[in-house]
């Protein structure tokens, strides 16, 4: 996935978007796959 404002996709094992559109490895974040929001992850790393 590519987070808002990012010109490169997130790492495969860090495919999360933070509140400011940044790529994050830990929660809280939005797990993404393509352009579809999968689920909120508040405690675990998105994988």
From Swiss-Prot:
List the source organism: Ancylometes sp. (South American fishing spider)
Alphabetical GO CC annotations of the entry are: extracellular region
Similarity remark: Belongs to the neurotoxin 03 (Tx2) family. 06 subfamily.
Q: Which Pfam families match?
A: D_CNTX
Quick one: where is this thing mainly located?
Answer: secreted
- Reported tissue expression: Expressed by the venom gland.
Which InterPro entries does the UniProt record give? CNTX
Q: Does the keyword Cytoplasm apply?
A: no
Q: Which UniProt keywords apply?
A: Disulfide bond, Ion channel impairing toxin, Knottin, Neurotoxin, Secreted, Toxin, Voltage-gated sodium channel impairing toxin
The record's disulfide annotation reads 3-17, 10-23, 14-46, 16-31, 25-29
Q: Name one GO molecular function term.
A: toxin activity
Entry's free-text remark on domains: The presence of a 'disulfide through disulfide knot' structurally defines this protein as a knottin.
Identify this protein by name.
Answer: Delta-ctenitoxin-Asp2e
This molecule's function is given as: Inhibits the inactivation of voltage-gated sodium channels (Nav).
Q: State where the protein is found.
A: Secreted
Looking at the record's lineage, which domain of life comes first?
A: Eukaryota
